[in-house]
Amino acid sequence: MTTLPVLLVTGASRGLGRGVAVEAAAQGLSIAVNYASNREAAAETVALCRRAAPSGSQQFVAIAADIGRREDRQHLVDETLAAFGRIDALVNNAGIAPRVRADITEASEESFEEVLRTNLQGPYFLTQRVARHWLQERYPATLPGGFKIVYVTSISAATASVNRGDYCISKAGLAMASKLWAARLAAEGVQVLELRPGIMATDMTAGVKAKYDALIADGLVPQRRWGTPEDVGRAVRAILAGAFPFSTGEVIYLDGGFHISRL
């Protein structure tokens, strides 16, 4: 078993997950880089982690797994433990957008099932598997304040978009999952926090960049810029460093002030 803290990040081949992995590598953690299918992108994340790492003893392993599949979730945990012998933190980041942005009067059940399987069912039951491991093995945590679970949700958890209802519902459910696991695991030395990003510059939003450029310029985001993977990575880094020792089940907004009610 490694003596360094180990972070498992889902959906880490690109976007927000890559930002989280690279920041954690710079912090001195070893990392399991989960990806669904893009092996080359995952290898690039691993290379970036190695470049950022301050210690040659840190390890970085890419593990293919579709978290929407039960057997893949077990494989992901098994492979992480085989590589490192322990898990100290889990960042539930992996998620998908609907293939088609359809009005909720026309959206398909197939899209609903696909989005919720990956965005909600997957992280909920992956958390269950990791939590069971901690409760069974009872090894001491190496991170300040104990073990950590971070749910990366979205402003869509509380903001209605009628052309992607499945996505909004998945993120709203994930926000509740964070609270549920926080309540269940607090006494076990596990801190659970939700990060709620706003409009982020990633592959997922590339197709609507012009639309959101205009909205941001018009003041939709008070800080008047896009969020970045680095913004999310820095927030996770603070959590891993124990910056919020008396918090669990809380929401940390990373949205440039989008959530502020304004006149």
Range-by-range predicted roles:
Residues R132, A182-R184, P245:
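Alpha-helical segment proximal to the catalytic Tyr-Lys
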Residues R101-I104, S108-L116, A217:
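Substrate-binding pocket helix/loop in short-chain dehydrogenase/reductase
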Residues T127, S170, S178:
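Active-site helix of classical SDR
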Residues A186, Q191, S247-G249:
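Short, small/polar-rich loop/turn modules that mediate ligand/substrate recognition or access, typified
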Residues A97, R101, G219, R237, ...:
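Short C-terminal tail/terminal secondary-structure segment
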Residues S154:
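Residue(s) in the substrate-gating loop at a strand-loop-helix junction
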Residues S13-G15:
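Conserved glycine-rich cofactor-binding loop
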